[in-house]
């Protein structure tokens, strides 16, 4: 099964890579060009793009069978990222919260109950 992980922290990316690679075909979507280059040099499959844009997910070949993991680090608009992933055809979207606050996740659940 294919997995697209939208992450911006290197520690989270490396941890997910170690955990998911045995069972999934994992690709990471990052916004930072230096981070993408560093991860690519380390042998990880990385794409560079804006996670708030639908065309980014279309380029990553997101389908209804693609698992999309979105890191909530509290810095970006989570709703726009999730909406873009769903508009591109993603049906399996999960939020990985790396902040202490659950307020953002609750707001997203109110907007998108499924």
PLM region spans:
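Cytosolic regulatory regions of ion transport systems
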Residues: 1-114
């Amino acid at each position: 099964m294919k997995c697209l992980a939208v992450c911006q922290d290197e520690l989270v990316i490396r941890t997910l890579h170690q955990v998911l690679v045995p069972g999934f075909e994992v690709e990471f979507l990052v916004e930072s060009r230096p981070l993408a280059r560093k991860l690519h040099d380390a042998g990880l499959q990385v794409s560079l793009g804006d996670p708030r844009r639908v065309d980014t997910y279309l380029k990553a070949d997101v389908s209804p069978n693609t698992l999309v993991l979105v890191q909530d680090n509290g810095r970006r608009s989570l709703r726009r990222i999730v909406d873009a992933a769903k508009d591109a055809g993603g049906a399996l979207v999960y939020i990985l919260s790396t902040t202490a606050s659950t307020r953002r996740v609750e707001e997203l659940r109110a907007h998108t109950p499924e």
